[in-house]
């Protein structure tokens, strides 16, 4: 009957709903596309089809559908948040924030707006703004939507605090994520590596890093954390073994940090030439990352300076550290800049 009477839009809408509930995405898509052929301005069909395209990772198509909805009806509030979410997945944080600002101009503040804004600011390495928005999101959720405050939410908040060098607060928040989800190994590794990286609380770092490795033993980032923990503990042979295993796990996508760590371990074992080779690999990878950098990244620039300094290129190291310091002035960076100036 529907094939003979394509104008029966209500029937098609009901069928699309039934197919979606039965996880028959292809059949639902056919019905929604048929509705849009008959009535291209059907907001609901466009919105639902945008969600399907998003779930299929067809992000450009999803964004186009949500944008069309908003052109047809600027008061269609959920479309703003769906579009903002797609822009986040596309790694377009500035466009995410622009979409959220339009929503803010018309609607009351809500959790998802502030949460997405926090994630977007984190992507732009604007960590104080990220923290501000995530805390507002938490406050809004506590008042009306407490189920939104998941382990993932607190992981994002904890990571923002860590990136802003507020380590004690990051520690508290990341532990909260783990309390909510006791096997959330991503947060365990993040917390453990944070302490190992700044060479503090190594016993606690060991607890979390070892547990993360038990839960996901083939995760290269976790193996790197284990190797770096051994390095901080002065176990340089054990460190090298784990770090080389991490590099093997990442052989198809080499990681600058892993190769820098391997170089550090080799240097401690008296293998200066091999260390230099690893640092050069790390440097090459970092320079590639720098070329792709769309917004200033203090962490990347600091690491670049570290590797350049290890390779004896103090002038370039200082320039990179200076750029990092201008983005996020920290005491460790100030000391590095001062030590290089003293050597000269």
Roles of regions detected by a PLM:
Residues 4, 38, 72, 105-107, ...:
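Structural marker of alpha-solenoid helical repeat scaffolds
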Residues 21-22, 55-56, 89-90, 123, ...:
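Register position in tetratricopeptide repeats
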Residues 14, 48, 82, 116, ...:
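Canonical tetratricopeptide repeat
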Residues 9-10, 43-44, 77-78, 111-112, ...:
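Helix-start (N-cap) detector for alpha-helical repeat units in TPR-like alpha-solenoids
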Residues 17, 51, 85, 119, ...:
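Residue-level recognition of tetratricopeptide repeat
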